[in-house]
Swiss-Prot record:
Extracellular side of membrane: 21-630
Low complexity: compositionally biased ranges: 708-720
The encoding gene: SEMA-1A
Cytoplasmic side: 652-730
Protein's recorded name: Semaphorin-1A
Amino acid sequence: MRAALVAVAALLWVALHAAAWVNDVSPKMYVQFGEERVQRFLGNESHKDHFKLLEKDHNSLLVGARNIVYNISLRDLTEFTEQRIEWHSSGAHRELCYLKGKSEDDCQNYIRVLAKIDDDRVLICGTNAYKPLCRHYALKDGDYVVEKEYEGRGLCPFDPDHNSTAIYSEGQLYSATVADFSGTDPLIYRGPLRTERSDLKQLNAPNFVNTMEYNDFIFFFFRETAVEYINCGKAIYSRVARVCKHDKGGPHQFGDRWTSFLKSRLNCSVPGDYPFYFNEIQSTSDIIEGNYGGQVEKLIYGVFTTPVNSIGGSAVCAFSMKSILESFDGPFKEQETMNSNWLAVPSLKVPEPRPGQCVNDSRTLPDVSVNFVKSHTLMDEAVPAFFTRPILIRISLQYRFTKIAVDQQVRTPDGKAYDVLFIGTDDGKVIKALNSASFDSSDTVDSVVIEELQVLPPGVPVKNLYVVRMDGDDSKLVVVSDDEILAIKLHRCGSDKITNCRECVSLQDPYCAWDNVELKCTAVGSPDWSAGKRRFIQNISLGEHKACGGRPQTEIVASPVPTQPTTKSSGDPVHSIHQAEFEPEIDNEIVIGVDDSNVIPNTLAEINHAGSKLPSSQEKLPIYTAETLTIAIVTSCLGALVVGFISGFLFSRRCRGEDYTDMPFPDQRHQLNRLTEAGLNADSPYLPPCANNKAAINLVLNVPPKNANGKNANSSAENKPIQKVKKTYI
C-alpha cells in the first residue's frame, strides 16, 4: 500500500509539473476575417508568385515576385503600375534550365534581392531560370532603365525557395546564400571576400533567416548542422555570425577570405537541470530598443522550433545585442583531434592581436592570427535568452511558428511601454502576444496571448510579416504568403463584443483602454489618449482594475473557429487562387475570452462585422485546461486505488476457510500436535503416539497387509508362472 501511494504521489508530481510546462496560454480573442475587413493584393493569379518583401520606400512596399517587382501602396495595397519593373529570363536561359531538369515554373526570374543605391537607382537580383543575374536600374523620365547587368552568383540564390538573405550597407551588398546550382556551396559574401569553401567548421548546410547591421558589424542569423555535436550524432543549432564592415581580407593567399568571421550559438530553451531546447531558428525581428526592468536595452526577438521529427514545439526568445557582443569577446571553442571533445581554448593559446576583431587594415595582420580565426570560428559560450526563458511557447500538432514582427514600445496611458509581438504560423494564423512583465523586470516572463487571428486559409504558411506605422489609427500589419499580400489592423478595440470595462481591461492589449468619459473601449490612436490614466482605464500586468468593479464574473467563449469553410461569397471583384477552398461563412468573427481560472464559462453566438447576432452554427463544446484534466486523471487513479484495496481486503476476509488439519504425512500432523496444549508434554522428550483409525502400513515394504483371500491388495488378479523369454540374436 505504501509503495502504491508513493507511486501515485510521484505520478501526481510529474503530471502537475508537466502540465505547468506544456500548458499553452489561451488567447483572449479569436478572430476570423471576411473579405470586407481585409485589404488584399493578389498579383499574378494564374501562377505562383513567391512574394518576398524587399524594401519599404516611404509609403509603399517593393515586393519581389515572378518576373516582376511590384510597387504597392501601404494605404490600400493597390499597385503603382507606372513604377512596375518587369524582368523576364531570356529564351536561351530558359532552354538551358529545362535541360537541367527543371519545370516551367522553376525556369522563371524570381526577384530575391533589391537594394536602393540612391533615390533614383536600385540594384535588383533574380534567380533568372537558375542562372542568377543582377542589374542596376535608373529612374529616367518616370521609367526604370537598365544601366548594367552582371552575374549574380553568390549574391542571389538559384532556387526561389532557398533560405537566403542580403543587406546593402555603405555601398556594399552583403549576401548569405549558395554559389552553385545544387545548393551545396553555402557562403557569406561581399565581393571579393567569402567564407571558406567546403569547410564545415565555418558553414555546415546553413539555412539563413536574416541579416542586419549594427555599429561596425554585419550580423547573420541562421541554423546549421552542429559540427561540435557530430561525434554524438546529428543536431541542428541556431547561430548568429558576424563580420566587420571594413574587413579587407587577409595577407597574401588569404586576400579573398574573411578575417573577422565568427559565430556563436543562440540558446533558446526552457531552463532546468536538463534544459529543453528549441534549436531551429526560423525568423528574427529587427533590432528593438526599449526599457526593460528599468534598463535601456537593444533586443532581437527570434522564432525557434523543434525539429520536424520531434514534438511540435515553437517558442519566441529575445536576445540583447550586449550579450551577443559579449559572446564574441569570450573564449573560442576547438577540437584538438578528430575524436576529442570540443572545449574552450585556453587564453594562453590565443594569439595577439586577438583574432576576429575589426582593425583598420586586415591585410597587415600576422599569418598566425589569420590562421587561427580560419580554424576557430566558433565561440565557446552560447548567447543566453534575455528574459532567462522563452517569452511564448506553443506545443501543437496543428502549426509551428514561421515569422515574427514587433511593434516596439507601444505606450499605455499609465506611461509604461510594451513590445507587441505578431507571430505567423504555417497554418495561416497570426498570434498577437506580449510579455506583460517586461516593463517591470528583465528576468521575468508573464506571457499574454491577446489574439489568435486566422488571416490566411488553413494550411497556407505565413512567409513574412511587417508592421506599418502610419499617422493616426491607420497603422496595420502586412501579412505575406506565396500568392497574396494582406493588410489588417493592429487591434480590434472597437469591437461591439467588448461592452464593458472588465472585458476591455482583461484583454491586456496595449492598444486598448476603457474610456471613462465615452464609456467604450478606445484604441491607442484616440485623440484624447494623452489624457492618460485620469480618463483611460488599463492594466497590462494584471488584466483587471479596481475601477471596473472587481474581477470579471463570466467568460465569453464562442464556438470553435471553422477551419474548412465551404461557402463562397459572391460579387467579390478579386479572388485568390486559394479562395475557392477558403471563404468564411460570416464576414467577420471575433471571440473574446477572459483568461481567468475562477470564472464561470458562458457562450456567445457568432456576430458578424455589422453587429447583428446570428444563430450559432455549431454546438458549444466545453473547454478544459491541462490542470483540470491532470487533476481529473490523478483523482481517478487515487479513487480506483482506494476502491480496489477495500474490495480486495473484504473479499479476502470473506473467502478465508477453516484450518486444514487432515494432512497426509504424519510428521506434519506431529508438528501441529506438538504445538497444541494436548500434545505438549514437558516431562517427556518424545512425542506421544497419535491415534490412527486406519489400517497400519508395512513401512518396510510400503504395502498394506494381505486381505482375507491371502492376496496382496497391490498384486495382480492372477498368479501365473513366469515364462522365460526366448531371445534370438541375429
